[in-house]
Amino acid sequence: MEELNFDVVVVGGGPAGSSAARIAAENECTVALIEKEKEIAETVRTSGVTWISDIKKFKIPEDCYNSIKKFSFCSPKNSVTISDNVAKAAVLDVRKTYRFLANRAQSSGAKIFTSTNVSEVLKNSDGKCVGVIAKSKDKHIQFNAKVIIDASGFASVVAKELGHVEQWKKFGVGAEFEVKTEELEQDNWWLMVGQEYSPAGYAWIFPTSKNTARVGVGIGKPDSEVDPTIRLNELIDKKIGPIKDLGEIEKIEFHYGLIPNEGLSRKTVYDNLILVGDSAGQANPLVLEGIRYAIRFGE
């Protein structure tokens, strides 16, 4: 088995993991960033909505997002639109943004290992985490580290394996399609509330360009047993609410994700193990938005 030594090993190549890896590398630590997928952001699990003020703080380029000036809200019987003179919100190109963050970590000195899935957490005689073993293609690699950062998202892979945390009991489940549309206001997003849309959450239309958008449904668990994927397909097929104004819809890609909704209920430091991002529950419990928190806490 190949054995590698690092000051810091980060598990998870999302926004929290890439940000943590970059900061550690900038502070002259040797850093390994481990990502189980073939490439960063191979699978999209978020709608990518955030605020432009935060984007600018994180120095994310303008070509990584679509700006939003109008905010439309509707229930089955009412709707309202609030407009700004300048764009304040944004819908991220999730893949482009995550890869930008990872490339920045790599440029700072972090070594990225893709297609590398953690299979075992290593402990010393005191039960302290000292590394991980991961399967990478046709071999196993032992990563020894002084500090482990669990940025594995909802799964909390390292912390759960060590017995520090249990599965989240309260969480949101989101399903969405990236779609091509006939008609779309590029700078106007929609949030749809009410039983017709989601019995414990909301539905959305988030434009990503002049003719593409993310249309989705989020449902809180265990508050509702409704499957968001089934509800989403019903809304699109029946063209309910503002979805009807999109005209013909061509489904491009399906996204599905889980996000914890228990607030900052977890301890985030266990000796030399640090939890960041969704692993630590660092998300807005009102609308279940977490990218800006993941980057900030990762840093």
What are these model-derived regions, one by one?
Residues 107-244, 265, 281:
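Predominantly flavin-linked oxidoreductase catalytic cores and closely associated redox partners
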